[in-house]
């Protein structure tokens, strides 16, 4: 098994040159964060909205790079098994910080909220849970953008964390957890 720091993960052009798939720029950036992170596209040929998102994606890379490079990786759910979503997280060695990536590959009508049981956290630590990158199409739940919760590690690992509702296919969100 290779560490995440050895995995090339880049934001590619869209539609993808290999499979022709159309995936939101945000999702491509969120997924690329759990690897070496980079861009494989001509920025002069992408929409201005995507160009405007690049500084934020690079800032997120710098913010989470040490965590991704040195943390422990946990695969929480696989699209290959559930045919709906992927979910994985990286937890720092001292268990004081984690980054969860949730990707809704395919949306389902009238689908109830998903509770994802997290892994690798300190059971007795209280974590500040921050849903990042929220917008009108990728909201952080019924309480609005940038909802913050305080939950214990044992609660997050045994009861789980409710994933935000998202409209459409190939949507993603990052959830940052910081021990208080």
Model feature map: region roles:
Residues 32, 100, 129:
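Conserved, mostly hydrophobic/aromatic
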Residues 80-123:
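Carbohydrate-binding surface patches
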Residues 107-180:
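C-terminal beta-sandwich/jelly-roll accessory domains of carbohydrate-active enzymes
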Residues 14-19, 40-42, 48-49, 107-110, ...:
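Flexible loop/turn segments at secondary-structure boundaries
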Residues 1-44:
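Glycan-recognition surfaces
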Residues 26-78:
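Catalytic cores of secreted or luminal carbohydrate-active enzymes
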Residues 30, 96-98, 171-173:
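A generic secondary-structure signal marking the coil-to-beta-strand transition
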């Amino acid at each position: 098994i290779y560490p995440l720091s050895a995995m090339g993960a880049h934001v590619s052009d869209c539609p993808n040159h290999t499979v022709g798939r159309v995936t939101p720029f945000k999702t491509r950036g969120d997924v690329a964060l759990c690897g070496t992170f980079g861009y494989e596209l001509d920025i002069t040929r992408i929409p201005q909205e995507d160009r405007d998102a690049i500084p934020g994606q690079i800032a997120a890379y710098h913010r989470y790079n040490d965590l991704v490079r040195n943390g422990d990786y946990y695969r929480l759910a696989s699209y290959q098994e559930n045919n709906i979503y992927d979910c994985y997280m990286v937890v720092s060695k001292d268990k004081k910080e984690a980054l969860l990536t949730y990707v809704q590959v395919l949306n389902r009508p009238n689908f109830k909220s998903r509770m994802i049981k997290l892994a690798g956290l300190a059971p007795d630590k209280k974590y500040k849970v921050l849903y990042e990158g929220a917008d009108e199409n990728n909201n952080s739940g019924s309480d609005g953008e940038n909802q913050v919760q305080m939950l214990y590690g044992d609660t997050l690992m045994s009861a789980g964390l409710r994933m935000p509702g998202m409209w459409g296919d190939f949507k993603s969100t990052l959830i940052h957890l910081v021990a208080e």
